[in-house]
Amino acid sequence: MRATRRGVIGISIAASGALALAACSDDGGGGEVDLEKQSKGAMDGFAADSQFTATEAFTLSLLWTEWPDLPITDSWQFFTEIEKRTNVKLEVTTIPFSDAVEKRSLLISAGDAPTVIPLVYTGEEDSFVSSGALLPISDYVEHMPHFQKYVEEWDLGEMIDNLKQADGKYYMLPGLQEVSVPVFTLVIRKDVFETVGGGIPETWDEMREALVKIKAEYPDSKPLADGFEAASMLNYAAHAFGAQAGWGFGDGMMDDGSGKLEYTAASAGYKQMVEYFRGLVEDGLIDTDSLTAANDGSGGGSVSEKFANELVFAASGSSGTAIEFAQALNETVGEGNYEVLQIAPPGGPAGQVCEPRNFWNGFMLNAEITESENFLATLQFLDWIYYNPEARELLRWGVLDETYTKDASGKITLKPEFRLDAYNINPDGATDIQKDLGWSNSVFADSTESRALKESYNTPTFVEYVDSVLATRTPREPNPPAPLDEMELERASLLATPLKDTVDTNTLRFIMGERDIAEWDDYVAELEAQGLQQYVDLVNTARERFEEENS
């Protein structure tokens, strides 16, 4: 499950954080810093593709999210090897997966957060910027040569610019991805879709046609499932309808095609998406339990069990979910008697599109780092661990020639005495490099990845998935930035939260048939009564100001 959970917590935290717009009024994080006086332990001439090793040892505090089935241990090789290579000892504050968002927010708001706050997705920093709790890290990226190198090489400069807040600075650094494809999409029984469903669906209409055929052949089935309270499926489906939903709802604002922003949940595309899924529910083509069962980070509704018992034939998931489904089918259908495939998100009325090119999780820094004598050394260490290729390989695979080997072509092979259960690699190995050694951990390993590194631990079918998305889907353009100032953030928080609550409740009610779609106009009127137009005007004003100031 961990391969699945790594994706889930990131997306669900990001979705929760996007509307956490409360602002505070403390000052901080913006004063002048004399790095020459705060360079203890820093390396002279630190450059891209070099190993960082502090010239004087120091300890760095770090916030660590703990998954229920991957408890952190002090004895992990991860900690000892990082300290051995860098002269930096990590001091960990642990928060549980179950309420990571709330715990993290409380620590930051109370001024008790550790120096480094990992597992941060773009937009989550917004709620803390005006309080002065976070370092405006854009002021210091000149000291992070690896970050600068890969932003340029992977053509990510414009995306980085979109991280800017109203003051023109950004307050988090993301994980960089050489190639960006949706992490979550549909995982299907390829053999059943080909023999019964008429082939691999390229559009949601083709998906419906296939589900009807599969339902006829397997009448006890409800062939489509989510498992993540509908948030995953609506996330990757919405783009095909010209909308944003589920995990990808964000602040609810979306480019209307003219450069202005509209509230997606009141749009024609959003309504069309809701009507589509309502039709699937009405015809018994979707497992409704999987839309409502509580999600603990692994996917609710016993989807894996239903997939194994041929009650579900397509479900939301990541590359890890595909492995999980295959393992479950081995116990029921039998190995060699099925094919599981992760497919590109189906297209729809808006075209063969998918989510915008995206970052993955990165980090924020407590603004108090500016008072540390190790400030520059900390920047160098984080630049190395987050963006150095050898560091990224270390975090995924462990120690070269000890836990894995690498041939002249760059192919990585885990040594036979080691295994990686999360990706079903060497299942007979005695030592799991994740659970026993701390490599491939959820806090660091997924952040920045080259395509080669991403493919090194995934299956050949995942490589096919990446190829298919890059060849057949066009990423939607990102929404234009509209950073809010402190007063706007406070106002937006008061408006956005009740609007989002109304959207979440009624989206599911419409889909489940608990509310007639004929009441759509009434639903929009309810949003308007909650201040929808004020919210839209507020964000568009910020958008216009940002455009004028940065044109």
Task: Spell out what each predicted region is.
Residues 2, 10-20, 25-190, 194-204, ...:
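Conserved N-terminal structural module of periplasmic/extracytoplasmic solute-binding proteins
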Residues 48-54, 136-155, 199, 246-268, ...:
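Short, solvent-exposed loop/beta-turn-alpha elements that line the ligand-binding surface or hinge
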Residues 91-95, 289, 341-343:
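General small-molecule cofactor/ligand-binding pocket signal
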Residues 125, 132-148, 211-214, 225-241, ...:
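Carboxylate/His-rich catalytic cores and anion/metal-binding grooves
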Residues 138, 165-236, 251-299, 306, ...:
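Helix-loop-helix "hinge/cap" segment bordering the ligand-binding cleft or interdomain interface
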Residues 307-309, 315, 323-339:
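Long, K/E/R/D-enriched contiguous segments that form extended
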Residues 338-364:
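Periplasmic-binding protein-like
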Residues 380, 384-505, 514:
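Conserved small-residue motifs centered on glycine
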